[in-house]
A protein has these predicted regions:
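Bacterial N-terminal signal peptides
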Residues: 14-22
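Boundary at the C-terminal end of the N-terminal hydrophobic targeting segment
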Residues: 25-27
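Beta-strand-enriched, solvent-exposed domains that form extended recognition/catalytic surfaces
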Residues: 33-135
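Intrinsically disordered, low-complexity segments enriched in Ser/Pro/Gly/Ala and basic residues
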Residues: 12-15, 80
Length: 135
């Protein structure tokens, strides 16, 4: 009985190893979708303790990308929001990152219960080579 268990575990291990080796081959390469530049997206976030609205302001190109170049479609931390870059037309996720803004912290204050305010916020994403959708 011990041999059968060993063979079963050995087969499971071999299958797991083959799967792990195949995964990196399917991972997207930074260079396929992005230039070594940064796309800075500026927004205004406005509202009060209950309501919030986000208004796109402008976009800038910065000369280099200082963010991660691997595992681009995975989020590593939880935040109050998420910026996602999709390939236009296919909705394939090319890049994802989470964030928390100063506005979201302010929403928890007493002042936010009786006053509306707006805050500037910027999101940095790798500069796409082709048209993308950002949400």
């Amino acid at each position: 009985m011990k041999n059968k268990t060993f063979i079963k575990n050995k087969t499971l291990f071999a299958a797991s190893l083959a799967l792990m080796m195949a995964l990196p081959m399917q991972a997207q390469r930074f260079e396929d979708n992005f230039e070594d530049k940064t796309l800075r997206l500026d927004y205004i976030v406005a509202g009060d303790s209950v309501n919030q609205a986000i208004y796109f302001e402008q976009a800038y190109s910065n000369p280099t990308w200082a963010g991660r170049k691997t595992r681009l479609d995975e989020k590593f931390l939880n935040g109050n929001g998420q910026v996602t870059v999709y390939e236009h037309g296919t909705n394939k996720v090319l890049y994802v990152n989470t964030f928390s803004t100063l506005f979201q912290e302010w929403q928890l204050t007493q002042e936010a219960k009786h006053l509306q305010k707006s805050f500037e916020s910027s999101f940095l994403v790798p500069f796409p080579k082709k048209p993308v959708d950002v949400s």
